[in-house]
Swiss-Prot record:
It catalyses: succinate + ATP + CoA = succinyl-CoA + ADP + phosphate; GTP + succinate + CoA = succinyl-CoA + GDP + phosphate. Succinyl-CoA synthetase functions in the citric acid cycle (TCA), coupling the hydrolysis of succinyl-CoA to the synthesis of either ATP or GTP and thus represents the only step of substrate-level phosphorylation in the TCA. The beta subunit provides nucleotide specificity of the enzyme and binds the substrate succinate, while the binding sites for coenzyme A and phosphate are found in the alpha subunit. It comes from Acidobacterium capsulatum (strain ATCC 51196 / DSM 11244 / BCRC 80197 / JCM 7670 / NBRC 15755 / NCIMB 13165 / 161). GO terms for biological process: succinyl-CoA metabolic process; tricarboxylic acid cycle. Mg(2+) binds at residues 202, 216. GO terms for molecular function: ATP binding; magnesium ion binding; succinate-CoA ligase (ADP-forming) activity; succinate-CoA ligase (GDP-forming) activity. Heterotetramer of two alpha and two beta subunits. Residues 9-247 form the ATP-grasp domain. Binds 1 Mg(2+) ion per subunit. PANTHER family: SUCCINATE--COA LIGASE [GDP-FORMING] SUBUNIT BETA, MITOCHONDRIAL (PTHR11815:SF10), SUCCINYL-COA SYNTHETASE BETA CHAIN (PTHR11815). This is Succinate--CoA ligase [ADP-forming] subunit beta.
């Protein structure tokens, strides 16, 4: 689950992590009230920041520095309500429905801090880099040595000596080391207490008077742990999420919309990724990732079908099922029911193997509907790509 920057900063502030003074605003009037208050309290400028669930806001024109109240009003009018396009939103962009108005900081250095799970090491890793303000993936690709890492032993947690090592690696001044250690320990505690899956401070800044701030931050939470955090669950902003993904989550379906025209319905995340790969290998483009899981019932299959066909870009559907816990006949009943109910106009290609596969194939054959069956994954992928092209 993603949250907004202002929400992440509110959480971090409770753990003693220094963040700039600021408040969220939902209207122009609220934005100006915050800006007036900050200027009255001695701010030399304010930053007007679009609040959307995407990175690259600055490059897209969603972050502006205002040195006067007039400039703040100009930028707030410009950004609030705009369709902000970044490298993470896609060409359609995301509508800005709220702003964060913050006091500017006298930046001396821009650094990076982050905590994430390293699956290869089976441990959390606390990362730091002197290349702040840049995408960390870009830094890792160009110069992996620029990222310093401290692996966290789950038995003892993140230790102060590790924080000191990272602080020295960042080249912080001796007078800043103790504050940096407290800063990092606060980040780690926030990460653990909230069942986060990602925590990034980018940039983590030092100021000309040797203070440390989280100038921008991002926190994602583990969806599977949200039953323990009702307060955090309330921070979810459904308006920032894809409507089809929101609909899928209601039925415990793992759905992610993509940019292609071949819809995929698969059981199992690994097979789903392999299915997307083989579609591309055959010359097509997947329209989504959809894992219906091993315990899907007929009703979930029907809902999955409705969601797939709600995407206007879909020209064909590829159903790739290896029946184990999810029996093939159960899937077949769901597919036939959905196809009849929705009066499906696009070609449907199936590759079926596993438990009750013969019963499933018979259900499809007896339905009288024009399903296309592939003998293998490769055969089915080639058929669905051809069908999407109208061949």
């Amino acid at each position: 689950m993603k949250i907004h920057e202002y929400q992440a900063k509110d959480i971090l502030a409770k753990y003693g992590v220094a963040v700039p003074r600021g408040e969220v605003a939902n209207t122009l009037e609220e934005a100006m009230d915050v800006a007036k208050r900050l200027f009255a309290e001695g701010a030399k400028g304010v930053v007007v920041k679009a609040q959307i669930h995407a990175g690259g806001r600055g490059k897209g024109g969603g972050v502006k520095v205002a040195k006067t109240l007039e400039e703040a009003e100009q930028y707030a009018k410009q950004i609030l309500g705009m369709q902000l396009v970044t490298h993470q939103t896609g060409p359609q962009g995301q509508k800005v429905q709220r702003l964060l108005i913050e006091e500017t900081a006298a930046i001396d250095r821009e650094l990076y801090l982050g905590i994430v799970l390293d699956r290869a090491a089976a441990k959390l890793v606390f990362m730091a880099s002197q290349a702040g303000g840049m995408e960390i993936e870009e830094v890792a690709a160009k110069d992996p040595s620029a990222i310093f890492k401290a692996y966290i032993d789950p038995a003892v947690g993140f230790q102060a000596y590790q924080a000191r090592q990272l602080a020295f690696a960042l080249g912080l001044k001796p007078t800043q080391i103790n504050d940096a250690v407290k800063f990092m320990m606060g980040l780690y505690k926030a990460y653990m207490d909230t069942d986060a899956s990602l925590l990034e401070i980018n940039p983590f800044i030092t100021t000309k008077d040797d203070k440390l701030f989280a100038l921008d931050c991002k926190i994602n939470f583990d969806d599977n742990a949200m039953f323990r955090h009702k307060d955090l669950k309330e921070l979810r902003d459904i308006a920032e999420e894809d409507p089809l993904e929101v609909e899928a989550s209601k039925y415990a379906l793992n759905y992610i919309k993509l940019d292609g025209n071949i819809a995929c319905m698969v059981n199992g995340a690994g097979l789903a990724m392999a299915t997307m790969d083989i579609i591309q290998y055959a010359g097509g483009m997947p329209a989504n990732f959809l894992d219906v899981g091993g315990g899907a019932n007929q009703q979930q299959i029907e809902h999955a079908f409705e969601i797939l066909l709600s995407d206007k870009n879909v020209q064909a559907v590829f159903i790739n099922i290896f029946g184990g816990i999810l029996r093939v006949d159960t899937l077949a009943h769901g597919v036939v029911g959905a196809a009849q109910k929705l009066n499906v106009k696009v070609p449907i290609v199936l590759r079926l193997e596993g438990t009750n596969v013969e019963e499933g194939r018979k259900i499809l054959k007896d339905s009288g509907l024009n399903f296309i069956v592939g003998d293998t994954m490769q055969d089915a992928a080639q058929k669905v790509v051809a069908a999407a092209k109208g061949q």
